[in-house]
């Protein structure tokens, strides 16, 4: 059930991004850019990066991308908290879900049995306060931001032509150092996140993703603008820190509830 929810939402989100970005063009981005995608998605990201860069010492666009990423991720903390709490509830419900699964066995060949199983599972999740969509929102929100950032970097000359450390933000890292760091931080971030996942099938699925996602990031990072790879790295480090902090807070809350 969770997989179907996520698959539908992710597919719709990707379709939304592709449709809007398809209406985009290669013209430079500024306040007069037209079209929903350019005016309401790409330009605000471009403006934010330029505004921050012009108000910090050295006018570093690399630092501006890092700050912008931290601001966006900080604004998404309430969604991350909701996601974490949802996972904690799912863990608590796991024994009951396993009993339900054992009770009905293989329901793939019996439509009536399958309907009854899904009905009882939905009731159990509802009574446990688990929201199957809670874990999807951070991903769905990041998709248009990620795509808009790519266009903001590639179509804003001031950002595209600026340098940060050894790279040009509008070009791929010639030494492939940033893509390797992005792939490593993606792997570590997923490893840290794994401890919050319910044991069983989801863990096996995550183990596959732990190999596929870093490999995909590495492959894409070889050709992606360095500014975009910098966004990945900053986001990964923020998510790792956030997961560790939230885990400690939730564990403390759980301990206090047990003592009460």
Curated annotation (Swiss-Prot):
It is found in: Cell membrane. Keywords: Cell membrane, Chaperone, Lipoprotein, Membrane, Palmitate, Protein transport, Signal, Transmembrane, Transmembrane helix, Transport. It holds the Pfam family 60KD_IMP. The keyword Ribosomal protein does not apply. A lipid is attached at residue 23 (N-palmitoyl cysteine). Residues 1-22 form the signal peptide. One of its GO terms (biological process) is protein insertion into membrane. A lipid is attached at residue 23 (S-diacylglycerol cysteine). The chain crosses the membrane at residues 29-49, 52-72, 133-153, 164-184, 213-233. It is a multi-pass membrane protein. GO terms for molecular function: membrane insertase activity. GO terms for cellular component: plasma membrane. Belongs to the OXA1/ALB3/YidC family. Type 2 subfamily. HAMAP family: YidC_type2. Required for the insertion and/or proper folding and/or complex formation of integral membrane proteins into the membrane. Involved in integration of membrane proteins that insert both dependently and independently of the Sec translocase complex, as well as at least some lipoproteins. This is Membrane protein insertase YidC 1. It comes from Bacillus cereus (strain ATCC 14579 / DSM 31 / CCUG 7414 / JCM 2152 / NBRC 15305 / NCIMB 9373 / NCTC 2599 / NRRL B-3711). The lineage of its organism: Bacteria, Bacillati, Bacillota, Bacilli, Bacillales. The gene is yidC1.
């Amino acid at each position: 059930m969770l997989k179907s929810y996520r698959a539908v939402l992710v597919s719709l989100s990707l379709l939304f991004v592709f449709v809007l970005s398809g209406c985009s063009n290669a013209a430079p981005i500024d306040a007069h850019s037209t079209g929903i995608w350019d005016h309401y998605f790409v330009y605000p990201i471009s403006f934010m990066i330029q505004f921050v860069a012009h108000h910090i010492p050295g006018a570093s666009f690399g630092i501006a991308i890092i700050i912008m990423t931290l601001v966006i991720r900080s604004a998404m903390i309430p969604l991350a908290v909701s996601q974490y709490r949802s996972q904690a509830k799912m863990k608590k419900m796991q024994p009951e879900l396993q009993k339900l699964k054992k009770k009905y066995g293989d329901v793939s060949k019996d439509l009536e049995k399958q309907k009854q199983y899904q009905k009882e599972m939905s009731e159990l999740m509802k009574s446990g306060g688990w929201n199957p969509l809670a874990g999807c929102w951070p991903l769905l929100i990041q998709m248009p931001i990620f795509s808009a950032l790519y266009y903001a970097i590639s179509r804003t000359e001031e950002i595209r032509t600026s340098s940060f450390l050894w790279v040009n933000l509008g070009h791929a890292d010639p030494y492939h150092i940033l893509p390797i760091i992005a792939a490593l931080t993606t792997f570590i971030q997923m490893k840290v996140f794994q401890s919050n996942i319910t044991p069983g099938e989801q863990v096996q699925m995550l183990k596959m993703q732990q190999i596929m996602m870093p490999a995909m990031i590495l492959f894409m990072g070889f050709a992606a603008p360095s500014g975009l790879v910098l966004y990945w790295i900053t986001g990964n480090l923020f998510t790792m820190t956030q997961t560790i902090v939230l885990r400690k807070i939730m564990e403390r809350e759980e301990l206090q509830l047990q003592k009460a």
